[in-house]
Amino acid sequence: MTAVIALVGRPNVGKSTFFNRLTRTREALVADLPGLTRDRHYGTAQFEGRQYLVVDTGGFEPEEREGLVAAMAAQTRLAITEADAICFLVDAKEGLSTQDAEIAQELRRGGKPIYLVVNKMDAKGAVSELPEFYRLGLGTPYTISAAHGHGVEPLLEAIFSDLPTSEDDTADAARKGPRIAMLGRPNVGKSTLVNTMLGEKRVLVFDEPGTTRDSIRIPYERQGKPYVMIDTAGMRRRARVGEGLEKLSVLKTLSALREADVVLLVLDARLGIAEQDAHLVGVAVELGRPIVVVVNKWDGMTPEERKAVKQELERRLDFIRYAPVYTISALHGTGVGDLYKSIDQLWIDSRRHFSTAELNRALADVIETHQPPMVGGRRIKLRYCHQGGENPITLVFHGNQLTRLPGTYKRYLESAFRRALHLEAVPLRLVFRQGENPYDPQPKNGRQH
């Protein structure tokens, strides 16, 4: 799984600055998802080729004699229990405080790797305060300037030298077959489905609402084919959790989704689709992961109830109408075997490579059927297409006035290329680049407009 590094410390010690320093060169994992991208307290970063997630837990502010009892918000508790490493930031300019000592005591109880980070070492008079921090009992401090980047690289080297790499047996197995992320709210039958798909009775869990844990990766074989199951903790109802728990749950979900080749979204037919379900789908879509919608507990429902569920699926999940939908009973195994047909096909399709010639033949047919619209008296030109990546399959279009291409025509392109390339069930990512075809031998002044 992608490592999670939590930034902990009292207010105004520079956590946000350090967060920005770590994440400055990386785009957010999710684009345009309300409640996610606007939350600037988490992000993705990279160090020496290893991607990781970083979360700013906010500041501790113990209140009078209650100490950390009141100040330890859900987000910070989750940082301690779910992070792989904790960077405990203190302020070299202000020196050691009572709050620092209280935080250090609480962090030690968590048993996670703690890196004491003395920030603002570039401040005047900071060096004279450094010896104080040894009294926290957390070993030799790492001195940095989050604002200017001094000392950050040695700190990250220390953290990642202690963290295990993901290149283990599970990763080796995953390269031979699909990695399946099992997502869903608690009590929808997710763990029962995992057990049924694995073909054995085993406890995977701690799946009760409110319980938090790391995702579990389970390599296994079915009919001679290798798979890896990534079982994540279920998403919680917002009313039952604090902001921080929701945040860390999202982090773990993002981590699982980054690793997955195929995502199974498990729904309870009797509970319908909650906001968290649609939210999970949105995350998977933004990451470009193929999705299979699995409607569990289908047995025992009346025809009228089944019709209502199908209508709700069409309405709430309209933006992934390409995704296959299966109705199953995880408890009795009904329909579970059919899931593998889609899993295997989606894994193959999402990794396909198309030649540039094939894509441009398809583009010519698509344009002949329906030309781009006229804008300002000139027709938008789609001149050239090539593949820019896989999982998700990314198609890069070059042409003129592409910034003015309407959304309706972009949707037409997506559906038309799905049909032409026989990619009906996997996400397609379309990228539009303004300019000339770099592979066209004709000079620019020989263009026909």
UniProtKB/Swiss-Prot annotation:
Protein family: Belongs to the TRAFAC class TrmE-Era-EngA-EngB-Septin-like GTPase superfamily. EngA (Der) GTPase family.
EngA-type G domain mapped to chain residues: 3-167, 178-351
InterPro entries associated with the record: G_ENGA, GTP-bd, GTPase_Der, KH_dom-like, KH_dom-like_a/b, P-loop_NTPase, Small_GTP-bd
Signal peptide: none
Molecular function terms, GO-annotated: GTP binding; ribosome binding
Residues the entry annotates as binding GTP 1: 9-16, 56-60, 119-122
Boundaries of every KH-like domain copy: 352-436
GO terms of biological process kind: ribosome biogenesis
Keyword entries, A-Z: GTP-binding, Nucleotide-binding, Repeat, Ribosome biogenesis
Protein function: GTPase that plays an essential role in the late steps of ribosome biogenesis.
Protein name as it appears in the record: GTPase Der
HAMAP family given in the database record: GTPase_Der
Name of the gene encoding the protein in the UniProt record: der
PROSITE patterns: G_ENGA (PS51712)
NCBIfam families tied to this protein: GTPase_EngA, small_GTP
Superkingdom of source: Bacteria
